[in-house]
Amino acid sequence: MVKTAYVTGYKSYELNIFKENAPEIKYLKAFIENKLKSLIEEGLEWVLIQGQLGIEMWTAEVVISLKEEYPDLKLGVIAPFENHIERWNEQNQIQYQKIIEKADFTESVHHAPYEGPFQFKQTDQFMLDHTDMTVLLYDEEQEASPKYFKRMLVDFAEQTNYTCDIVTFDEINVFINDLQWSEEESFE
């Protein structure tokens, strides 16, 4: 049974999403919500993120909204190092702080500022070691930063009994098409 899941994927700019009100976000959040609800019904208790912009932050927002329906659901934010948001613009820092305020657990893997890329790799390993499953939104057709984590994830899953769900754009598009179709049907 999956009690703790790590959800990660593209950063917003890797999806060419630069505004909080971009229509794509609505659909991605609906997809994430649908995925999480299925896991919650099977016993999911905790969702962990590292606090990256994009899929992870949208996941946090979804978890926070799901707490109304599932009050036992918990959100953990495990940053790779202290002050990892210091180079973000003010709007993104405010969004992050709102999530931190509503998270059930926050911590940094490294209790120091950025020292090198090894901190990201060690944090990725920490997430694998402390969760039962990863949901990774990543598609080989659009290579970006999650490709490094994907390699680590696949190797880890092959060596252990770890569960991974690598979500492609095809799966997301099928969900979006179904969602749009059901929205159109409800207006008739």
UniProtKB/Swiss-Prot annotation:
It comes from the Bacteria. InterPro entries: YspA. HAMAP family: UPF0398 (MF_01575). PANTHER family: UPF0398 PROTEIN SPR0331, UPF0398 PROTEIN YPSA. Belongs to the UPF0398 family. This is UPF0398 protein Sca_1081. It comes from Staphylococcus carnosus (strain TM300).
